[in-house]
């Protein structure tokens, strides 16, 4: 499985349906193209003030009317056991958008400590086991 990080959430313009005509902004076209090429999506979001960050909601708003998103296999990764509101909001939003949520691939991965980097997280057996299981479930769902 190849995982490609989409790192341009902040470059997307604020959603405006008037701009979503025949020629949407280039960054929106790029987002839609990347989503279209993906066999599945892995969404990991922090929780701010009991909700998802505005930049993530903005990106999802740009995907609502796109043909690339409906039916896409989606796994949700929650990195805080206490962050239940963002996870619930994402589930509601993505269901409304006709995503194919994969419950067995949607897990809570409590970060062992704030200073852990990718290498440190990989050394944590529980974290690695849970992440590996979620990715395997997503891969299996994509193959179905």
Task: Report the location of each language-model feature.
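Short, conserved catalytic or interaction motifs in soluble domains
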Residues: 17, 65, 79
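Short, glycine-/small-residue-rich phosphate/pyrophosphate-handling segment
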Residues: 72-111, 125-129
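Active-site beta-alpha loop architecture of Rossmann-like, nucleotide-cofactor-dependent enzymes
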Residues: 48-49, 115
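A glycine- and small-aliphatic-rich helix-loop capping segment at beta-alpha/alpha-beta transitions
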Residues: 58-66, 92-97
């Amino acid at each position: 499985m190849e995982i490609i990080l989409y790192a341009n959430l902040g470059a997307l313009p604020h959603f405006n349906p008037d701009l979503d005509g025949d020629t949407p902004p280039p960054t929106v076209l790029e987002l839609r193209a990347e989503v279209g090429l993906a066999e599945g999506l892995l969404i990991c979001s922090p929780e701010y003030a009991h909700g998802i960050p505005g930049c993530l909601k903005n990106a999802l708003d740009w995907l609502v009317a796109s043909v690339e998103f409906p039916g896409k296999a989606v796994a949700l990764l929650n990195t805080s056991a206490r962050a239940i509101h963002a996870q619930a909001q994402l589930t509601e939003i993505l269901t409304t958008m006709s995503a194919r949520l994969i419950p067995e691939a949607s897990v809570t991965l409590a970060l062992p400590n704030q200073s852990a980097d990718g290498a440190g997280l990989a050394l944590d057996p529980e974290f690695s086991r849970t992440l590996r299981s979620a990715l395997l479930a997503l891969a299996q769902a994509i193959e179905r």
